[in-house]
Structure formats: C-alpha cells, structure tokens
C-alpha cells in the first residue's frame, strides 16, 4: 500500500474511501482533501459580499450621523432666529413713540414751509412783471433764428440731394458686387459639387477594387475547398484501391486504376477551364471600369479648368469694382464730414437760442404754477368764508329761536347769547366746518343734518341711500357708484375720503379718493370698480374688484377723519 497524504491520513473518512477503491468523492473536495476551484470561487464571492455589506452599513451610519448633525444645526439656527424676532418686537414697541415725535416735527416743518411759500408768492408776481419785456425780446430773437434756420435747411436739402445721388451710385456698385458674389458662390457650389462627384467616383473605384479583392479571396477559398475535397477523394480512392487490391484480381485492379486516372484528368481539365473563364471575365470587367473612370475624370478636369478661368475673371472684375467703391467712399466721407460740421454749427446756434428761451419759459411756467396755486388757495378761502357766513347766519337764527323759547317756556336747557358761559369749538377738516354749542351743564348739542333719500328702483331691485350733509351716494350703474353734491352754491373737498364696500358684513375693499379731489355744486362723480368696462374714466377704485349690488352688500362713504357721511344698500339689508 502506498503511503497516504498527511492531510488524508488525518481524515479517516477520506482514508477509508480511498482504501476501499471508491473514487466518487463529494463535490468540492479533491482526493488530496483540499477545496476545488468552484468552492474557492464561492468562498471568495461570499467574502466580497460581506465586505460590501459592511461598507454599505458604514456609509449608512455616516449619512445618519450627518443628518442628525444637520438637524441639530437647524434647531440652533431656529433658536437664534426666534431670539432675533423677539428683539425686533421689543424694538418696535420702543421706537413707536419716537416715530410719533418724528411725525410731529415733520408736520411743524411742513407748516413753516407753507408760510415761506406764501411769502414767495408775492415776490414771484413781481418777477413775472419784470420778465415780460425779456420774454418779448426772446420771442423776437426766436423768430429771427427760425428764419436763419429755414435758410440753412434749404442749403442742407441741396447738399442732401447731391449726397443721395452719390449714395444711389454707390448702391448700384454694391448691387453689382453682390451679383458677382452670388456668381462666385454659385461657382463655388458647382466646384464643391464636382469635387463631391470625384470623391464619389473614387469611392466607387475603391469599392470595385475591394470587390475584386474579395472575389479573388473567394476564388482562393473555393480553390482551397476544391483541393481539400480532391485530397479527401484521393484518400477515399486510395482506400478503395487498397480494398480492391486485397479483394480483386489483377484485371480488376487495372480497370479501377485506369478509370481513376481518367476521372482525375477530367476533373483537372474542368477546373482549369472554369478558372480560366472566370479570370477572363474579371479582367474584362476591370478594364471596362478603368476606362469609364478615366473618361469621367477627364470630363471633370475640363469642367474644373473652365471654373477656375471663370473665377479668375470674376476676381479681376471684383478688384475693379472695389477700386471704384473706395473712391466713392472717400468722396462720401468728405461730403459727410462737411455736412456734419454744418449741422454742428447749426445745432449749436439753435441750442443757444433754445436754451435761453427755455429758461425764460421755465421761469414763466413756475410763476404761472405759483399763481395757480395761489388762486386755488384764494378760492378755497372764499368758499370757507362763504360757508362760515352761512353757518353764522344759521346759528344766529338758532340762537334767536332759543332766546324766544327761553322767554316762553321754563326748561333746564338754556342757550344764552354770547357770554362767558357759552363755549364754541370750531373744527376744520378740509373745507367743511362743524360748530358745537354747549349749555351750562357742559352737554354738547350736535347740529348734524341726516338726509334720508327716497328709495330707487334699478333692474327691478329697490335700493336706499342715507346721507349726512350735502355729499351722498345716490345710485349705482355699470359696476360703479355715483356721488352727488346737493349743495347749490358750495363745493366740497373730497381729499382722502374713503369708500368701504361690505359683503355679508365683511369688508371686501377700501378706496381712498385722491388728494385735491373737488366736487362742485350739483355735480355727480362716478367711481368705477376694476370689473367695470369703463376703466378709462378719471376715478377707478383700484382696491375694489367689483361693486356687487345685491341684498347682502353695502357701500359706505367716510370723510377724511373716518366719520360716516352716508351709505347705499338694498332696502332689505340688515344693518
């Protein structure tokens, strides 16, 4: 018994199997007791998979750690932002009083500025009187400058006519150049087409050459196959001859030998004739193709020579045209420079006259604007004076009636004639005044006149308007409301008045009337919403999309101190 391998000697199972003469070992274990190649590959794959899983788990742990760190950073940032918001809120409460002080100071400075402007108005009127003779002189100077400008323009027109003639000639030459360029591009296209045709023919020639080489290769392969077949047949024939030699007589052997030589000779003759015929056919086809390619190349070379001659002729013509164009350009530049010099002199003179005239006109415009402002203020003062006189007369009547009532009836409510006990307070908002009369018990009596207009029917629906004073909302039409001043002699200033539109008791939009909005006696003003088709009118409520006049809507008119002046709603609206 041969000596066993030490590894097998330590494995009793393998030793018994080998001693018993069995060779069917388990898969993956060789007779020497080591793992096979497949088992080793499987072990390597398992080890690689475990390493890859370990790396993925480490990567996931790192990503989780980064995510936790980012969350902590964002929480810290949120805490910092909350602290900043708290500081901003404290600062807002602290600086509110300062903003009020700034507003009061600005108001005082604006009042001072108004007084200064009033002082400047008188001096502006005097300056207007002084500037009138200078304006007359400036107008005369402007007329003379305009006459000079007309003469300069006539000369300029003549020079422009000459320049247009030169430009037309230049344009004609440029068109000739463009025509030559087109012809040149056409020739280039033709040359490129011819070159492409030559490349195509060369490619066909290369293709034919490749085909010929492939045919030769195929013929050689066929010849090799025939030689292999012949050798196979010769081997078979030799085997048959050997068999015939063993099994036949001399006569049969000679017969088979003779027949074999004759068949081999016929096969060789047939192969030689076929190969000669094929070679002759390929040679004739190759010569024919070479002849055709030579003829085409001669034709293309002739066309290319003609194209070269044409290009040379066009280049010479183009050089001549360029020379003429350069001469024309030099002349044009000289004329253009001369025209620019004349234009500069003319513009400089005209600019000086216009500058002086503009300064005078600006001064006059400023004076006119100041006068217009003064006239508006004067009209406002006159209106206020008229209103005060009418209100004084009205209150005199009330006081006379109160005096009569005091002498007729015994009452705790007493209205005396002007005395230290009666106190009147006058409040001015815009151009409207209200007067409060107090009795001896310090009770205020407001003389406000509430006017309730009659109901109106629009589109089979009834609406009602309520007004306090002369300005009220009277109707609506086409997504707009109509405001009327019922006073017959007094205008109203609607600056900063407000219009609030409510739907189902909720405020849906507010519009503030522009500054310097006045409504004259018996005048009607339409205020349109954004949904109105008449957006080109003067007043459009940009903060109110639609005046939805239904049973659940209400439109309220407020003055500049947010006191309710009137409202307009459906008769069934629940206030």
Curated annotation (Swiss-Prot):
Instruction: Give Gene Ontology CC terms.
Output: cytoplasm; intermediate filament; nuclear envelope; nuclear lamina
Q: Residue ranges of region Coil 2?
A: 259-408
Q: What ranges does the record give for the region Linker 12, renumbered to this chain?
A: 241-258
Task: Describe the location of the LTD domain by residue ranges.
Answer: 459-575
Stretches the record annotates as Coil 1A: 57-88
Q: Which UniProt keywords are given for this protein, alphabetically ordered?
A: Coiled coil, Cytoplasm, Intermediate filament
Where is the segment annotated Tail? 409-572
Q: Which InterPro entries match?
A: IF_rod_dom, Lamin_tail_dom, Lamin_tail_dom_sf
- Can you tell which superkingdom this protein's organism belongs to? Eukaryota
Q: Which family does it belong to?
A: Belongs to the intermediate filament family.
The protein's name: Intermediate filament protein ifd-1
Protein species of origin: Caenorhabditis elegans
Encoded by which gene?
Answer: ifd-1
